[in-house]
C-alpha cells in the first residue's frame, strides 16, 4: 500500500475514526488523564464499531482488515489521547491479533467473539524484572493441572490492561 495514495476503504476508515475520536475521545482525554482514570465504556464502544477486532478474521467477529487499517486507527486515537490509544493497541494488537494468529481453533471460537465485541478486554503480561520485554528471555511458566486449571510461576512487572476490565 502506498501510504500517500490510500485505498478508498482506508480513507473512509480514517475519516470515521477521526470524526469519532474528535467527538468522543478528545473531550474526555485531559480529565481522564489528570484523574488517572480510564474510560472503559468508550473502549467498549469501539467494539460496536468493529474496531476492537480490526485484524481478526470476520468468522470470529473481527473486521478482517489489514495492518494499514490498524495503523490508521492507532494514529487517529494517538492524536487525541495517547493513553487511550495504548490501551486500544494492547487490546487489539497484543491480545486480539496475537490470539487470532497463534491461538488454537477452540480458543479462537470461544474468546475472539468476546474480545472483538468489547464484552471482554484483552491484556498482556510480558515484562519481567530480569529481561524486560525480551520474549525469548521470559522465564514465567504456565502448567495445566490435572483439574484443568493452570498454575503460573514467575514474576511480572505489570500487566498491560490488567486493571481495565470489571
Task: Map each language-model feature to its residues.
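Glycine-rich flavin
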Residues: 19, 25-166
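A non-catalytic, amphipathic alpha-helix used as a structural packing/dimerization or gating element
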Residues: 9-23
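Intrinsic disorder at enzyme termini
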Residues: 1-9
